[in-house]
Amino acid sequence: FAEESIYMAAYSLYKDSPNFNLDQTGTLSAINELQSYLNNYPDSKYREDCTIMIKDLRKKLEKKAYEKAKLYYKTSPFNIASLKSAVIEITNFQRDFPDSDYNEEMAYFKVVSQYDLAKSTVEYKQKERFEEVLKFYLEFIDKYPQSTYLKTAEKWYTDSQNEVTRIAKIEAEYKALQEKEKSNTSKIATSPQ
């Protein structure tokens, strides 16, 4: 009797779980209760039902996280904070839902968001951020070599390579100029007057 009561309480939380676009506190509670039930009654006749419900609830959390990351991606062209947030949310999504059907799209969005961030950022941070684009692109093609997004992602990769090369050249020229000035300064300081 107690087992059935606990199952029914967990089941009612499952039924009460809100749509993905709403706060998911109830969904998390339902998952916890269903998992607790399975842990306490591993041989229950409701085992399969609980497993199916947990998968269904996790799909809801996945959809919520996907839509959140996608929203940051869509709003990201408007400001640098949104670009950073898009990359962070996409990274969190990939970590939390490694087997998601949305991961190919998310990996592409991550490349684009990081590229836009690198282009929009202050000069002294650009090289590092373009190098991140290169890293994200390589992760993308490693996982999705046949992706429909491949051609577009290649453009961001090539542009990023060119930017890293351009910035490295500027840095080398600046360093050479500093060395030359330092050398000239020391010659002036050591020359007899």
Protein language model regions, located:
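Acidic, polar-rich low-complexity tracts and alpha-helical solenoid repeat scaffolds
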Residues: 1-193
